[in-house]
Each structure stands twice: as structure tokens, then as C-alpha cells.
């Protein structure tokens, strides 16, 4: 976990799909697209909001760059609400509008068989890959850090 508080207590994080739509067209292949709202809930969160939002921005740049390119969607694709519990803690709800393309192709050697492929988003020309290790600081406070495998 990039966020230290969630590394200590992962039960404070809940992720669910709030609503979804399956889009498909009558074509020769069985391709479709998931369109859904992912809801991320952080309970009793006492950290800096940037420690949550920056990893989301980083993830979106790599995995949903089309949302950042579309002026109609870029300002609405991530929404959030905070319920202040105390002077230092909140329940933070974040909603992300996401898409995922799914394709099929005939499976070699299996009559009538198909392989399902969840295609990765193409790399946007303006997106530079992030380093495998990064940290986020606000003044002298470490807000978040992450070591990740850069392979798609």
C-alpha cells in the first residue's frame, strides 16, 4: 500500500463497484466494454488528502489516459466526499469513472473455443513511465511511498 495508514490497517479500505454498464455492438467479434463507477472508501482516515489523490492521478495517467484527454470527462471522472468524524479524521469516499475493453479471439485447436483478452490501454505519448520507487512529501512529512513492478 502506498499510504502508510492503510499498510498498518488495511481494513480501513473498502473498494466496490457502485454502478456499471456493459456496452457492446453487433459486430463480427464478441467485444465489449465495461463502464463503471469504482468507489473507494477510506474509513477513519487521518492522513493528508494528497497521499490518496496523487496515487490515483498516477494510476489514471497510466491506465485511463483517455479520461485525461477528454475535456468533458476529465473534470468529472474523479469525485470525492469527506465526512468529518473528528478534528483529525474523516471517512473519505472517492468515485472514479472507469472503462475496460474486452476482446475475444478464436482459441487455436479448440473448436468453438475463444480466448478472452482484457486489453491494456495504449501508452499515451505524453505519459512518461514512473520510476519503480517513488515517495510523496509535504514539507518534511512523508505522505506516501510505493515500490511497484512497472511491467504491464
Task: Name what the model sees in each region.
Residues 1-12, 17-19, 26-35, 39-92, ...:
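Extracellular/virion structural assembly segments
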Residues 20, 47, 109-113:
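Residue-identity detector for glycine
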Residues 107-152:
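Glycine-rich, aromatic-bearing surface loops/beta-hairpins
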